[in-house]
């Protein structure tokens, strides 16, 4: 490999080519009338999908420079998907159009930094416009919750209604998780015991799914302790017992570090022990109480602590807690269907209620209510089934995306869908003035690009966007949308064409962030194969040739 510096017009042209490629490949999947894209796989038949996230992942240009630029696009859009589970297609449409418009102005001799500053100045005004259109979803309006999920699940009403049912069962703050079902029933909702707390895995090496970046265990044991674990020796007897049982293990401790953590990681990587470790939730006395809650919920005989005089070396499997399923992300741990002692849980619930009544601190009362909700609220499990493994996986992906979008809608409310939220938010820029003519160009770029999502939705439906956009902007009704599926104008909330405000916001913020970075990048250093590597590649590939150029 040889390092090559690419800059100037050559780099700008590469940015433009990648932006055009992304816009023409990912954007065609947008909306109910979006088209599918085939993605070639290293093995098996190509995957046919209209999921913008999968299409973005599938774009792998041959030229090293284009591949590097595409990876910047992709990572930014993936961040959008990670945060809200949706919005990848909208993000890619906005990003590519911002870059294409900005490059035109830069080619005309305008200062790229000033253009970027104007774009950033426009950002705050647009975000205020999105917020002003947002309306909260009352818990009793399950039809709106369902509609958000239906749209995110590509129109699947069963998914939308099931998610609405799950939200109704556990409330807006409740825990909802997704798992695969062994039965053939496509989707069902089950309410079970469980808990979620805000602590993630202590090492990414514990991850069991690289695609989703999570740890997921079925039927695990749980070792719960107040102690800080730094030496592996005391843990060896119980770890050996867990290995013999064939089950995975979740360790919850004050902290796990040094030799203890490194040994667990090494054993996991070697395949000898299915294990993950997280820090205990809370702080001080509250942490102790939360660990007791988890022990009660999972049927653990006790929380291991110095006061009990119990040695780690003497632990048996009967002392540990168990659960039906645990999921650990980098931020959260969810325990589903712990083998709880119902009397023990009830006793703790009553104890917490009593503490709430006697507490004189509003802060303490709030934390006690949080513990009460975790103990008594339970977990709604969306069980996804199907005839084949491929069908189950595809359906589960859609359920998880729809669930993310629904949570986003509950968190920040909903806005009119069909691309009009961004179109209407652009009116906030009508009177915004830049500090210079070039800053004003940046503001005008954002104003123009905010119509790109609706233009693409309409184009994918085979219609002309100019007339539709003109009609929408002249009505002075920010709830009016064009329904590309029904081919008519309608009220967004009546027709159920709505988007989570958070998804729209994150997609816009992410797009303007990556566009600002790319348009102000003057040079890039890329690795390109040297002549010897190209020759070797050509011989090894039966004369098909290696990568040439940037």
Curated annotation (Swiss-Prot):
A GO term, aspect molecular function: unfolded protein binding
EC numbers on record: 5.6.1.7
CDD domains xrefs: GroEL
Cited Gene3D superfamilies: GroEL (3.50.7.10), GroEL-like equatorial domain (1.10.560.10), TCP-1-like chaperonin intermediate domain (3.30.260.10)
Catalysed reactions listed for this entry: ATP + H2O + a folded polypeptide = ADP + phosphate + an unfolded polypeptide
Locations listed in the record: Cytoplasm
Entry keywords, A to Z: ATP-binding, Chaperone, Cytoplasm, Isomerase, Nucleotide-binding
SUPFAM superfamilies: GroEL apical domain-like, GroEL equatorial domain-like, GroEL-intermediate domain like
Residues binding ATP: 29-32, 50, 86-90, 418, 499
Highest taxon in the source lineage: Bacteria
Gene Ontology biological-process annotations: protein refolding
CC annotations in GO: cytoplasm
Top-level EC class: isomerase
Membership in a protein family: Belongs to the chaperonin (HSP60) family.
Known role: Together with its co-chaperonin GroES, plays an essential role in assisting protein folding. The GroEL-GroES system forms a nano-cage that allows encapsulation of the non-native substrate proteins and provides a physical environment optimized to promote and accelerate protein folding.
Subunit organization: Forms a cylinder of 14 subunits composed of two heptameric rings stacked back-to-back. Interacts with the co-chaperonin GroES.
Name of the protein in its database record: Chaperonin GroEL
Species of the source: Wolbachia sp. subsp. Brugia malayi (strain TRS)
């Amino acid at each position: 490999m040889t390092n090559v510096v690419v800059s100037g017009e050559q780099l700008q042209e590469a940015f433009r080519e990648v932006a055009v490629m992304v816009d023409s490949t990912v954007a065609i999947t947008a909306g109910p009338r979006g088209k599918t894209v085939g993605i070639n796989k290293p093995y098996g038949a190509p995957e046919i999908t209209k999921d913008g996230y999968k299409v973005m992942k599938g774009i792998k240009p041959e030229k090293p420079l284009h591949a590097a630029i595409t990876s910047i696009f992709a990572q930014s859009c993936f961040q959008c998907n990670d945060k809200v589970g949706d919005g990848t297609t909208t993000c890619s449409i906005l990003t590519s159009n911002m870059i294409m418009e900005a490059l035109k102005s830069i080619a005309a001799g305008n200062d790229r930094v000033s253009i970027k500053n104007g774009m950033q100045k426009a950002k705050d005004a647009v975000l205020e416009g999105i917020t002003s259109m947002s309306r909260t979803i009352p818990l009793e309006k399950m039809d709106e919750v369902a509609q958000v999920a239906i749209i995110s699940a590509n129109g699947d009403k069963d998914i939308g209604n099931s998610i609405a049912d799950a939200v109704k069962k556990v409330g807006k703050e409740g825990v909802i998780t997704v798992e695969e079902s062994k039965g053939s029933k496509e989707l069902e909702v089950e309410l079970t015991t469980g808990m979620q707390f805000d602590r993630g895995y202590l090492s990414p090496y514990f991850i069991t799914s690289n695609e989703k970046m999570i740890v997921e265990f079925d039927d695990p044991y749980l070792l719960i302790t107040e102690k800080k674990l730094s030496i592996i020796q005391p843990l060896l007897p119980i770890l050996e017992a867990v290995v013999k049982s064939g089950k995975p293990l979740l360790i919850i401790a004050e902290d796990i570090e040094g030799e203890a953590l490194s040994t667990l990681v090494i054993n996991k990587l070697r395949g000898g022990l299915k294990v993950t470790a997280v820090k205990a939730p809370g702080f001080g006395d509250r942490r102790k109480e939360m660990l007791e809650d988890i022990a009660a919920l999972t049927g653990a005989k006790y929380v291991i602590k110095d006061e009990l005089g119990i040695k780690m070396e003497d632990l048996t499997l009967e002392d540990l807690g168990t659960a039906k399923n645990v999921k650990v992300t980098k931020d959260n741990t969810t325990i589903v269907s712990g083998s709880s002692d119902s009397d023990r849980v009830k006793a703790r619930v009553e104890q917490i209620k009593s503490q709430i009544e006697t507490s004189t601190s509003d802060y303490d009362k709030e934390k006690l209510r949080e513990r009460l909700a975790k103990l008594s609220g339970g977990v709604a499990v969306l069980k996804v089934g199907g005839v084949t493994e491929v069908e189950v996986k595809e359906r589960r992906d859609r359920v998880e995306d729809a669930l993310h979008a629904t949570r986003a809608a509950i968190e920040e409310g909903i806005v009119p869908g069909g691309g009009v939220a961004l179109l209407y938010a652009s009116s906030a820029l009508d009177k915004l003035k830049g500090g210079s003519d070039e800053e004003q160009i940046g503001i005008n770029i954002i104003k123009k690009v905010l119509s790109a999502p609706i233009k693409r939705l309409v184009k994918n439906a085979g219609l002309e966007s100019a007339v539709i956009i003109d009609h929408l902007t002249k009505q002075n009704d920010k709830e009016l949308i064009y329904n590309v599926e029904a081919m008519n104008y309608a009220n967004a909330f009546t027709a159920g064409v709505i988007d989570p405000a958070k998804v729209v916001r994150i997609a816009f913020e992410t797009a303007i962030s990556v566009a600002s970075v790319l348009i102000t990048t003057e040079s890039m250093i890329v690795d390109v194969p040297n002549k010897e590597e190209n020759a070797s590649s050509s011989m090894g590939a039966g004369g098909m040739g290696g990568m040439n150029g940037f």
